[in-house]
């Protein structure tokens, strides 16, 4: 079986015209450096605009981040801020929709959500979730559908699911000639 070189997997595809996905991620008090590294790697792969690392969330240079990110920490724009509220206020002032990823009852199903780009998606602490004051600032709350009994995903895994759903939806908006079938 012939292997396609990794660098060539997007060549000539409907993704070429996208360039950068007009989306950012804000990590609020994500404690695991490995999760932070995984977000860097996913952000790089999906062409995410920026990572905002807030509170106790680790930031480069940290060995555990580098180990998981595999160099993506050098290619993805990022910034650290101890307080996330001013970051959210600045993003909102620049026209971003602010969305929290939570398992709350009032959250919209990820596959039904129609994000307004540019968008910033917030992920919180692995156990405690997003701070209430930050959650209250969000324009929308989004949940990933879960059929199992745990109703829980690792935060970096959840990030991958949400980021790639954003890419799918943005591709359909930016390249109508090659839309993906909507979820029904």
What are these regions (language model features)?
Residues 1-184:
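Post-transcriptional modification and biogenesis factors for structured RNAs
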């Amino acid at each position: 079986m012939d292997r396609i070189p990794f660098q060539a997997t997007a060549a000539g595809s409907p993704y070429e015209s996208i360039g950068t996905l007009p989306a950012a991620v804000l990590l609020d008090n994500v404690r695991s450096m490995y999760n932070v590294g995984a977000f860097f790697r996913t952000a790089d792969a999906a062409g995410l605009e920026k990572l905002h690392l807030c509170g106790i969330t680790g930031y480069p240079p940290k060995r555990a981040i580098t180990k998981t990110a595999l160099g993506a920490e050098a290619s993805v724009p990022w910034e650290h801020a101890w307080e996330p509220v001013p970051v959210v206020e600045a993003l909102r002032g620049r026209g971003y929709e602010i969305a929290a990823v939570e398992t709350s009852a009032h959250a919209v199903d990820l596959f039904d959500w129609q994000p307004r780009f540019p968008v910033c998606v917030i992920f919180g602490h692995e156990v405690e979730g997003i701070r209430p004051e930050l959650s209250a600032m969000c324009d929308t709350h989004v949940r990933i559908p879960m059929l199992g009994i745990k109703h829980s995903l690792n935060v970096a895994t959840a990030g991958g699911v949400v980021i790639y759903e954003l890419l799918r939806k943005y591709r359909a908006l930016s390249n109508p000639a090659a839309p993906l079938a909507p979820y029904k």
